[in-house]
């Protein structure tokens, strides 16, 4: 974890661009500007430790080295012009060409004719505006001063501000006249750009003031470069290590000595060297102490990143080179050589720095200027127009004052906004400081509370331990007295116990003899009761065992019938497939016979055969059709039989399930009765509680036995009824086959009627056969209803499902039988269609 938060890229960029002469106020103004524009709020880094104390300078220095924000000459940008030889000339040219007071309001797109007309009608045309009336002379002067201060790159305005400090009030009025003349020169230059035929006169220039300002500015820039101020970066704690980057202070005296190539005395050099060495020792001691304090919080076992170590080594070598005497001597020699080259190559220096020549030139210029009495104190506006400064001032006030008034209003509004933002930031910082103090107080209070509670707990613990010890001592004394009393009592009880044991042994012997005699008599009586109870239990449970054996036998017969039905179903399916194959063969024979008939018809037309031969061929066709109808009838009957067998198999499965449940129920009842018998025998009762049996089973044991006897008779009659039903089905099949053979073999009956009768008989067989089965099913269900209530409900469900299975075959064509059979084979239940079958029965 770092000691301070990382600096963002935009902050590093701003740090690199700050000049050496800047101070901490630049960071404050930049933060205010950022708040004013509302771009992003600067986040202050954490420069405090977790305990609330400030970080040391060594910690801040290491953190800056870590994040690469340490201010050094290698990271600072160059200030000033690119060519050092032409620095003074560049400053003079900038001061001459820069026109900050008029440039912002110059209108380049105005027609020159309109400018001439406005200048001629200047005194008459005056704009009355509330904004211009509100502005006073003092506000204008303050605006001009503020503009001259706010223009950062105007060397002339800075030189003008420097000269104002030394000149008197008359020079201030002259400087104002120069500003008006500069405005007029700009206006004349603009008009001259539009009208190239007029040659403007050369501009007047006070070279003395410009050169003095340029020299001062150049001197200040050189001083800033040689003695850069160590900035405090906008972040961290402010330190007092400013101005220690260089050992020498390049003052005016030093610069004069350098320019004059005069060496300093050796004694002064020795004194400076001693002073520097003493300062170095003090610094080294201070840094060693700081490093020792900083090393306490560091981990010596951790490895430093190679890149960071390499950067730190390069920075140390660079800083050591900056403070070495060899570098300084080489730099001084380079500066001397460069100054010599500048003096030799700079021809303008001989011209502009020669005061006598400049004075003579100024005197000549003034004499030439005084000769022009006609245009004295007037400005050439171009096109032969000369105006006085007062007229130009009026025209400029008419054009510029509204704009200046609006600018002043906006500036005042912006100023008020800046003040409000500053107040808000101050209030926010104040509240933040209060909150931080509150947090610190909370932390300290928490620590105090912890210490106080710990002390209180210790005191309470001591007092409670003392109380417990005292109570324990009292308890021990009290218990000792009780133990002594109990020991005496124990001795008395032991003596009494011995006497009581002797007495009880004698009583136990007598009681044991009496109990042995009673037990022998009671055992004989219990054996006699058990034999009698077992006989009664066997008599009562005999019908239940018989009922269970009959139910198991019935279940076995039903399973065998189901297997027989499944075998019959598989046989009928094979027969159906065989009949379908024969029908397809008969169809092919019919197609072949049709083709043969066509050929025979053609032959009859050609050869004229007799009628008998043709009828013989037609009789063959009729025989084939009869055989086809016969096979279709057999197929329909077998499909109906298959469907009925499917229904019977479902009924048998349901009956087997019902019998299984009945068997389980009877087993449970049997186990219940056996349990009740055991309970009664254990209690010594002769009979079972009949009321309890009636509550559990719904009837008494005698009623249950009589009912089970009737159920046994019905179970014995069931296989005889099934055999009768199967015999009736076989007789009906034989009758249908005989009728078909008679119809197919008759000579006098036509083929169409024979086929119709075969289909009708098959449908009649289909309708009669289920009706008889329904009646038989109803009879059997009626018998079962008379016997048992619970078995009646199951038998009703079976009879209804049987009716549903039989009624589904009523009025169904042979084509639809295969579909319904496939539905049954897929496992469709019969009970789901009971409502539809009941509606069909009503119809």
UniProtKB/Swiss-Prot annotation:
Major localization class: cytoplasm
Modified residues (Phosphothreonine): 720
Superkingdom to which the source organism belongs: Eukaryota
Chain intervals with Basic residues compositional bias: 33-44
Region (Disordered): 13-44, 120-174, 717-843
Composition skew (Polar residues), residue ranges: 127-137, 163-174, 798-810
PANTHER family for the chain: EISOSOME PROTEIN 1
Family the entry assigns: Belongs to the EIS1 family.
Function noted in UniProt: Required for normal formation of eisosomes, large cytoplasmic protein assemblies that localize to specialized domains on plasma membrane and mark the site of endocytosis.
Protein name stated in the entry: Eisosome protein 1
Taxonomic source organism: Saccharomyces cerevisiae (strain Lalvin EC1118 / Prise de mousse)
Underlying gene: EIS1
């Amino acid at each position: 974890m770092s000691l301070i938060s990382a600096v963002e890229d935009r902050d590093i960029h701003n740090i690199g661009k700050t000049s050496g002469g800047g101070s901490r106020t630049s960071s404050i103004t930049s933060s205010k500007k950022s708040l004013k524009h509302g771009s992003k709020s600067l986040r202050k880094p954490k420069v405090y430790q977790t305990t609330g104390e400030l970080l040391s300078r060594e910690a801040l220095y290491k953190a800056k080295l870590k994040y690469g924000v340490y201010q050094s000459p290698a990271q600072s940008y160059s200030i000033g012009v690119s060519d050092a030889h032409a620095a003074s000339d560049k400053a003079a040219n900038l001061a001459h060409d820069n026109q900050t007071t008029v440039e912002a309001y110059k209108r380049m797109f105005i027609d020159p004719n309109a400018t001439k007309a406005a200048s001629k009608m200047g005194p008459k045309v005056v704009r009355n505006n509330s904004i211009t009336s509100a502005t006073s002379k003092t506000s204008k002067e303050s605006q001009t001063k503020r503009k001259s201060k706010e223009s950062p790159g105007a060397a002339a305005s800075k030189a003008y501000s420097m000269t104002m400090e030394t000149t008197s009030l008359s020079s201030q009025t002259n400087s104002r006249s120069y500003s008006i003349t500069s405005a007029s020169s700009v206006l004349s230059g603009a008009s001259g750009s539009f009208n190239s035929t007029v040659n403007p006169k050369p501009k007047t220039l006070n070279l003395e003031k410009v050169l003095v300002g340029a020299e001062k500015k150049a001197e200040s820039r050189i001083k800033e470069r040689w003695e850069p101020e160590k900035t405090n970066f906008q972040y961290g704690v402010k330190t007092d290590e400013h101005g220690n980057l260089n050992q020498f202070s390049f003052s005016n005296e030093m610069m004069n000595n350098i320019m004059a190539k005069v060496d300093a005395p050796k004694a002064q050099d020795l004194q400076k060297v001693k002073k520097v060495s003493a300062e170095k020792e003090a610094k080294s001691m201070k840094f060693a102490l700081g490093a020792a304090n900083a090393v306490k919080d560091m981990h010596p076992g951790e490895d430093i990143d190679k890149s960071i170590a390499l950067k730190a080594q390069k920075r140390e070598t660079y800083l050591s080179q900056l403070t070495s005497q060899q570098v300084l001597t080489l730099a001084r020699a380079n500066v001397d050589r460069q100054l010599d080259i500048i003096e030799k190559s700079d021809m303008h220096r001989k011209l502009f720095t020669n005061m006598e020549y400049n004075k003579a030139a100024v005197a000549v210029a003034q004499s030439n200027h005084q000769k022009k009495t006609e245009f004295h104190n007037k400005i050439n506006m171009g096109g032969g127009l000369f105006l006085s400064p007062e007229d130009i001032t009026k025209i400029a006030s008419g054009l510029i004052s509204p704009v200046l008034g609006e600018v002043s209003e906006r500036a005042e509004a912006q100023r008020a906004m800046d003040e409000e933002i500053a107040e808000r930031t101050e209030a926010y910082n104040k509240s933040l400081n209060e909150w931080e103090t509150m947090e610190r107080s909370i932390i300290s209070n928490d620590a105090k509370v912890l210490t106080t509670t710990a002390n209180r707990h210790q005191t309470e613990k001591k007092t409670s331990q003392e109380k417990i010890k005292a109570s324990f001592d009292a308890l021990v004394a009290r218990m000792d007295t009780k133990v002594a009393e109990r020991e005496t009592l124990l001795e008395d009880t032991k003596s009494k116990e011995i006497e009581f044991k002797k007495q009880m042994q004698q009583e136990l012997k007598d009681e044991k003899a009496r109990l042995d005699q009673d037990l022998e008599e009671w055992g004989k009586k219990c054996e006699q009761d058990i034999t009698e109870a077992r006989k009664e239990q066997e008599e009562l449970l005999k019908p239940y065992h018989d009922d269970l054996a009959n139910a198991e036998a019935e279940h076995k017969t039903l399973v065998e019938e189901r297997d027989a039905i499944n075998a019959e179903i598989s046989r009928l399916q094979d027969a159906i497939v065989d009949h379908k194959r024969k029908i397809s063969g008969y169809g092919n024979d019919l197609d072949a016979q049709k083709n043969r008939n066509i050929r025979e018809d053609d032959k009859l037309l050609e050869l004229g055969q007799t009628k008998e031969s043709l009828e013989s061929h037609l009789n063959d066709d009729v025989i084939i059709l009869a055989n086809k109808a016969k096979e279709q009838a057999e197929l329909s009957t077998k499909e109906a039989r298959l469907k009925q067998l499917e229904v019977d198999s479902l009924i048998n499965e349901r009956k087997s399930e019902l019998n299984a449940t009945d068997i389980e129920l009877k087993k449970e009842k049997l186990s219940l009765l056996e349990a009740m018998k055991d309970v009664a025998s254990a209690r010594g009762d002769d009979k079972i509680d009949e009321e309890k049996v009636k509550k559990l089973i719904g009837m008494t044991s005698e009623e249950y036995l009589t009912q089970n006897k009737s159920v046994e008779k019905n179970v014995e009659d069931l296989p005889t009824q099934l055999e009768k039903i199967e015999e009736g089905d076989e007789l009906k099949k034989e009758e249908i086959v005989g009728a078909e053979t008679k119809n197919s073999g008759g000579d006098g009956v036509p083929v169409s009627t024979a086929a119709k009768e075969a289909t009708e008989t098959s449908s009649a067989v289909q309708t009669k056969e289920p009706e008889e089965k329904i009646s038989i099913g109803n009879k059997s269900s009626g018998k079962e209803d008379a016997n048992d209530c619970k078995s009646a409900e199951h038998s009703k469900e079976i009879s209804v499902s049987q009716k549903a299975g039989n009624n589904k075959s009523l009025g169904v064509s042979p084509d639809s039988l295969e579909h319904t059979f496939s539905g049954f084979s897929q496992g469709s239940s019969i009970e789901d269609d009971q409502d539809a079958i009941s509606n069909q029965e009503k119809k």
